[in-house]
């Protein structure tokens, strides 16, 4: 029985932690749908309404889809030298096999 209580407590705490990021009061939902705004103005308005409890989130900055795309584009870079060397070795093996066929 105590083990079940501990498991339930851990489950409730985990759900509360994960749901905190997606929870919004109704007033914020109504404000967002009440009128058209630019993305910058909307983000600034939301940051002002968040208050002191979200100090760490404000330090992280906006986390919209456009920021994820920018992060992904940073990760796409030219192949590393090690990969190029590996391709050279594979090519060397292929050329060696072709040369052996020519001599036989």
Swiss-Prot record:
This is Gastrin. The modification Phenylalanine amide is found at residue 92. InterPro entries: GAST (IPR039236), Gastrin/CCK (IPR001651), Gastrin/cholecystokinin_CS (IPR013152). Keywords: Amidation, Cleavage on pair of basic residues, Hormone, Phosphoprotein, Secreted, Signal, Sulfation. Residues 22-58, 96-104 form a propeptide. One of its GO terms (cellular component) is extracellular space. GO terms for biological process: G protein-coupled receptor signaling pathway; response to food. PANTHER family: GASTRIN. Its main location: secreted. The keyword Secreted applies. The modification Sulfotyrosine is found at residues 87, 103. GO terms for molecular function: hormone activity. It is found in: Secreted. Sulfation on Tyr-87 enhances proteolytic processing, and blocks peptide degradation. Levels of sulfation differ between proteolytically-cleaved gastrins and between tissues. Residues 23-104 are annotated as: Disordered. It holds the Pfam family Gastrin. It comes from Rattus norvegicus (Rat). Residues 1-21 form the signal peptide. The keyword Magnesium does not apply. The modification Phosphoserine is found at residue 96. Gastrin stimulates the stomach mucosa to produce and secrete hydrochloric acid and the pancreas to secrete its digestive enzymes. It also stimulates smooth muscle contraction and increases blood circulation and water secretion in the stomach and intestine.
């Amino acid at each position: 029985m105590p083990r079940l209580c501990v498991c339930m407590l851990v489950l409730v705490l985990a759900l509360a932690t994960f749901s905190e990021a997606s929870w919004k009061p109704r007033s914020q939902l109504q404000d967002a749908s009440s009128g058209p705004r630019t993305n910058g103005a909307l983000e600034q308005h939301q940051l002002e309404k968040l208050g002191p409890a979200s100090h760490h989130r404000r330090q992280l900055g906006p986390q919209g889809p456009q920021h994820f795309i920018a992060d992904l584009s940073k990760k796409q870079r030219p192949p590393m030298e090690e990969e190029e060397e590996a391709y050279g070795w594979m090519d060397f093996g292929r050329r060696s096999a072709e040369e052996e066929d020519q001599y036989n």
